[in-house]
A protein has these predicted regions:
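A structural signal for short, well-ordered beta-strand segments and their strand-loop junctions
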Residues: 21, 102-105, 111, 180-181, ...
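Proline-centered turn/helix-capping motifs that create local helix->coil transitions or kinks
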Residues: 42-43, 99-102, 147-151
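N- or domain-start disorder-to-order transition segments that initiate the globular core
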Residues: 1-8
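Non-heme Fe(II) oxygenase catalytic core, chiefly the N-lobe of the double-stranded beta-helix
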Residues: 39, 71, 80-135
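A structural signal for well-ordered alpha-helical scaffolds and beta->alpha junctions
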Residues: 27, 31, 72-76, 85-89, ...
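Non-heme Fe(II)/2-oxoglutarate
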Residues: 8-95
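Catalytic core of Fe(II)/2-oxoglutarate
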Residues: 118-119, 126-137, 146-244
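Eukaryotic charged/polar low-complexity linker/IDR segments
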Residues: 140-142
Length: 244
């Protein structure tokens, strides 16, 4: 399956952690097809996350809905299956220069994502351990599908430094942009503000290596955030999946 545009543009950022931004990533016909097949908001297969955490309103993420890969059909299912394959994972290995990457057959953190107007996801570092395989969550991959995105739509992917004192980059979620980043305990990122419907597909790539036991994201507070964000983030790391 050939889905990658031969003329993509790759930018690598090394600080505060390795991030690869690839514009014009998908072949134009592939991109057009996915735009056409994107599920409407009235589709019954969308599911939300936790409204409450330990009896408190979830102030970590709201307005973010996911569509399970197992509920997709036809070309969309073929596309999603392929990006988890070892063949495609090897292509990502070539782009990033990281060897011995393994496709995530469990699809644990994968899916079609839409964030609705007014939604947000607080800053966090991703899960580290894939429980099904025992492998390390090495890379997180996202492709954006936001046609006609404008600055005033917000929905920026914020990148924060290791000690959470500075937002070092704000990446625009323009259509056909792929973002890949290297996971660590301090690969802090989030989407604190969404002012227009925001669409993406996300999945993870694994690797063998030393890793802790944390299999959930760990949310942290920005300097301007309510300190309860960090406190609730620790509780959220212990909550079972809302949908699996």
């Amino acid at each position: 399956m050939n889905i990658v545009n031969d003329n993509y543009d790759l930018l690598e950022m090394k600080q505060p952690y390795p991030i690869w931004i690839i514009d014009n990533f998908l072949d134009e016909e592939v991109l057009k097809t996915i735009h056409e097949l994107w599920p409407g908001l009235d589709d019954q297969n969308w599911h939300g996350g936790h409204e409450m955490i330990d009896g408190e309103k979830n102030i970590l993420e709201q307005g973010m809905i996911s569509y399970d890969i197992n509920d997709t059909k036809g070309y969309l299912n073929e596309f999603l299956t392929y990006i988890h394959s070892q063949d495609f994972t090897d292509k990502i290995s070539q782009m990033t220069g990281i060897d011995n990457l393994v496709g995530d057959e469990s699809m644990r953190w994968s899916g079609i994502r839409t964030m609705v107007t007014g939604g947000f996801q607080a800053v966090h570092s991703d899960a580290r351990l894939n429980p099904e395989s025992g492998l390390r969550k090495e890379l997180t991959c996202l492709i954006y599908f936001n046609e006609d995105w404008k600055q005033e739509d917000s929905g920026f992917f914020e990148v924060w430094n290791d000690d959470m004192t500075e937002c070092t980059n704000s990446i625009s979620p323009i259509s056909n942009r792929m973002v890949i980043f290297l996971n660590s305990d301090t690969s802090y990122h989030g989407v604190p503000e969404v002012l227009s419907e925001r669409k993406s597909i996300t999945w993870s790539i694994l690797k063998s290596g030393e890793v802790g036991e944390r299999s959930k994201a760990l949310f942290v507070s920005r300097p301007q955030d309510d300190k309860r964000v960090g406190e609730l983030g620790k509780k959220r790391a212990l909550v079972k999946d809302a949908h699996k």
